[in-house]
């Protein structure tokens, strides 16, 4: 009887050496995001982080998210260097809504066969997103799982923890009739609505490389999600922010009511901004109703801020100085009976 051929983990489809090569490749990206509160180095069983000493009654705020089917487009068009920014943005933009400063971030990268070059590009993007938001990339998990993913497919998830002073939590309880609403421009569809985006591409049979306002359509669609953390932390410190809404899945209709008391509504001036070209293209080529657009996409508005009307001019000046495109988009009003909490005029 012949002796069976010895098997290794690599024979089963898991390449430990590839995983080690990835860790080596991303060390510089991780180091760039390090905060003084981080203890120890990459590779420990658990990652350690102190709470900044400036907080008297610190409250930890956590969030987790993914990139959705935007990943499908990124994989199909081999654009891997910005989906990591998307991943971080989706988490940290949720934290800043409650006034929280992001402290640290962890990622989960899963694939059937680890491609070190692709994974390095993705994680370097995560590092860039963390750098943009002042957040430490403190650890993560790379899962190589043969038989679970087809071909070059991979999936991403992110987890973030931030901190806010207990007395400074922004929860919408201070919102009042007469408050102004300021919009911060998005960079594109961000990371929401991509199943509909892909359906529009399929039904319209459009060429993703076609020109749209001077650059290929696919570049508009894969533009990374804008991170608002640093500019909004400065606004929070300088003004009296009553509420913020991150316009993600569910669009205007679902995200704005999350931060409003039941007796109030947001009145949006629909003519106060022009939709970026990519949204008009999607609406036209998908024959999408306006209501559905506002329910699915941010339509050019990535973040809304509610604050007293007499603070608007100073807030707009500060945001402009921070490089944000911001404008007065509406106001808070009393809600009568069963009125919708969001009204777009």
Swiss-Prot record:
The keyword Cytoplasm applies. It comes from the Bacteria. It catalyses: 2-formamido-N(1)-(5-O-phospho-beta-D-ribosyl)acetamidine + ATP = 5-amino-1-(5-phospho-beta-D-ribosyl)imidazole + ADP + phosphate + H(+). Pathway: Purine metabolism; IMP biosynthesis via de novo pathway; 5-amino-1-(5-phospho-D-ribosyl)imidazole from N(2)-formyl-N(1)-(5-phospho-D-ribosyl)glycinamide: step 2/2. GO terms for molecular function: ATP binding; phosphoribosylamine-glycine ligase activity; phosphoribosylformylglycinamidine cyclo-ligase activity. SUPFAM superfamilies: PurM C-terminal domain-like (SSF56042), PurM N-terminal domain-like (SSF55326). It is an enzyme of class 6 (ligase). One of its GO terms (biological process) is adenine biosynthetic process. Keywords: ATP-binding, Cytoplasm, Ligase, Nucleotide-binding, Purine biosynthesis. It is found in: Cytoplasm. InterPro entries: PurM-like_C_dom, PurM-like_C_sf, PurM-like_N, PurM-like_N_sf, PurM_cligase. GO terms for cellular component: cytosol. Belongs to the AIR synthase family. This is Phosphoribosylformylglycinamidine cyclo-ligase.
């Amino acid at each position: 009887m012949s002796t069976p051929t010895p098997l290794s983990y690599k024979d089963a489809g898991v390449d430990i050496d590839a995983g080690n090569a990835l860790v080596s490749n991303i060390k510089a990206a991780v180091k760039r995001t390090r905060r003084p509160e981080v203890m120890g180095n990459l590779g420990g069983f658990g990652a350690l982080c102190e709470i900044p000493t400036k907080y008297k009654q610190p409250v930890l705020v956590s969030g987790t998210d993914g990139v959705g089917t935007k990943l499908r487009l990124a994989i199909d068009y081999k654009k891997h260097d910005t989906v990591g920014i998307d991943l971080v943005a989706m988490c940290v933009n949720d934290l800043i809504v409650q006034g929280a400063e992001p402290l640290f971030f962890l990622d989960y990268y899963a694939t059937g066969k680890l491609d070190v070059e692709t994974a390095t590009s993705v994680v370097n993007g995560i590092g860039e997103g963390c750098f943009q938001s002042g957040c430490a990339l403190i650890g993560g998990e790379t899962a190589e799982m043969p038989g679970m993913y087809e071909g070059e497919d991979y999936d991403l998830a992110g987890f973030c923890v931030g901190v806010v002073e207990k007395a400074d939590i922004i929860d919408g309880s201070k919102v009042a009739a007469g408050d102004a609403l300021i919009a911060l421009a998005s960079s594109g569809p961000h990371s929401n609505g991509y199943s509909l985006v892909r359906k529009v591409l399929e039904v319209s049979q459009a060429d993703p490389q076609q020109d749209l306002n001077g650059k290929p359509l696919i570049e508009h669609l894969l533009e990374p999600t804008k991170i608002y953390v640093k500019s909004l932390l400065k606004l929070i410190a300088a003004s009296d922010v009553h509420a913020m809404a991150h316009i993600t899945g569910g669009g205007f209709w679902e995200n704005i009511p999350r931060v409003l008391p039941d007796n109030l509504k947001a009145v949006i001036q629909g003519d106060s901004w022009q939709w970026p070209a990519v949204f008009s293209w999607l609406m036209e080529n998908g024959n999408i109703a306006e209501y559905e657009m506002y329910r699915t996409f941010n339509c050019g508005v990535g973040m809304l801020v509610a604050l007293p009307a007499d603070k608007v001019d100073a807030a707009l000046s500060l945001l402009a100085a921070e490089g944000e495109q911001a404008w007065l988009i509406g106001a808070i009003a009393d809600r009568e009976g069963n009125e919708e909490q969001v009204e777009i005029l």
